[in-house]
Regions:
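Patatin-like phospholipase
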Residues: 1-17, 25-271
Length: 271
């Protein structure tokens, strides 16, 4: 998607939720679309790896204590370490060091507050149940936004327990406009849910969250100026074998969208 955009339009603002926060962050600190693609090719197995240790803890907890004693199948620490290393190569550590306006949402699971991590300061308005922060480590912000419930453990930050931003801000157009964007293009990835009587625990979790995110997206997209929906067919959250397919699908979908709207290097401010 990013590759199709940079060839045709100027991206002046960028935001991303969950795995989209990885793409948004890498682009905002200067990595090219091809470098972002190579990042996912190289690190996807590490990011999505579910270790034997967590599986053992899950099983032993169920057998011995008759309860679930883990808060996720992946603790998220590997993702945070990888992002820290990748950002350090650009001499970027905290989010306020990023020049391109960037926004990454997460959710405080304890009280439902939406935590918005931004590279530019936004004044907190307490009535809207949002908390803005521009001092967090970039790697920590990405980990928080990617903490998909049940798959990744929640991220602890300043005595808060943060999880995937997609729970409340699947399309973060509000914060992007608060950063200063006049025109927002939102990218929505939709998955075709096919009947399957043999679902494992991961599929049950991911399909449940996907359904929730889909309904939330329908509600939220009205605030975006433009919306591009991309159907990823039956590709699951952890299916890293489909990276090439998704890369090409995103590129062709964006090109078709831009051609349909007759855009060619327009000076626009896009999410």
């Amino acid at each position: 998607v990013i590759l199709g955009m940079v060839k045709n339009i100027n991206i002046d603002y960028i935001s991303g939720t969950s795995s989209g926060s990885i793409v948004a962050t890498l682009y905002s600190i200067g990595y090219s679309p091809s470098e972002i693609y190579n990042f996912f090719k190289h690190y996807s197995k590490d990011i999505t790896h579910i270790g034997f240790k967590n599986i053992f803890k899950l099983i032993s907890g169920l057998l011995l204590k008759h309860k679930i004693i883990i808060d996720g199948l992946n603790d998220g620490k590997k993702l945070e370490k990888i992002m820290y290393k990748i950002c350090a190569k650009k001499d970027i550590y905290t989010i306020d060091q990023i020049n391109l306006p960037l926004l990454i949402p997460s959710v405080n699971i304890e009280n439902g507050e939406t935590y918005i991590f931004t590279s530019k300061k936004i004044r907190n308005v307490y009535q809207d149940n949002y908390v803005y922060d521009n001092s967090i480590l970039v790697s920590k912000a990405v980990r928080a936004s990617c903490s998909f419930p049940g798959i990744y453990s929640p991220c602890h930050y300043q005595n808060k327990i943060l999880v995937d931003g997609g729970i409340r801000e699947n399309i973060p157009w509000k914060g992007t406009k608060k950063l200063g964007a006049n025109t927002v293009l939102s990218i929505i990835f939709e998955r075709t849910l096919e009947p399957d009587p043999f679902l494992d625990i991961l599929e049950i979790i991911t399909k449940s969250i996907n359904l929730l995110s889909h309904e939330l997206s329908l509600y939220e997209q009205s605030g975006s100026d433009y919306v591009l929906k991309i159907n990823t067919l039956n590709t699951s959250l952890l299916d890293i074998s489909k990276i090439d397919f998704l890369y090409n699908l995103g590129y062709s979908s964006m090109n078709n969208f831009l051609e349909k709207n007759n855009w060619n290097k327009k000076l626009c401010k896009f999410e």
